[in-house]
Amino acid sequence: MISAPSGGGKTSLIKTLLKKDTNLTHPVSFTTRPPRRKEKNGRDYHFISDEEFKRRLTKGDFLEWSRPFGQRYATPKAAILRSIGRGRDVVLNLDVRGASFIKKKFKDAVLIYVLPPSLDALRKRLIGRSTDDSKEISKRFKLAKKDIANLNKYDYAVVNDDFGEAVDNLKAILTAEKFKVR
């Protein structure tokens, strides 16, 4: 599982890893938030209504879910279990709470936290995305500082200063984990 603060680069890193490793899969999560520019339903997220989210939650379709920043996000249970059953490595994009929950259910899960090079760089990235107003950026920045304080709950940390180097470091972790004696 890969976690990072908003603007930390986790989505871009995961997309690049998926292109480089054919055994890696990333089940598409569900969300109630509206799509951002260039996001497509079914590729980036399954964009659903709050009512649909509640229906699926009641039905047990989600492995875990959270509600950061007022919008709901969930990890699809069936897609993950199907991928694991086929021997695929699953990479998930989760917040700190979701990662902790999944680790309890899947003891062999590997938790990786992607750090920004600095808090100042993170603030600049959040502003540069132009997707949130200053109040929302402030909320995301505050949560990022809180989440970074939980770094000790993760197995690895990767600094995303140089994108190519961060991708290589993530690939190295995935490779090392395949050969780890458990």
Feature map (PLM): residue ranges:
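Walker A/P-loop
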Residues: T11
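The feature captures the helix immediately C-terminal to the Walker
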Residues: I14-K15
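NTP-dependent small-molecule kinase module
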Residues: K124, G128-D132, K146-R182
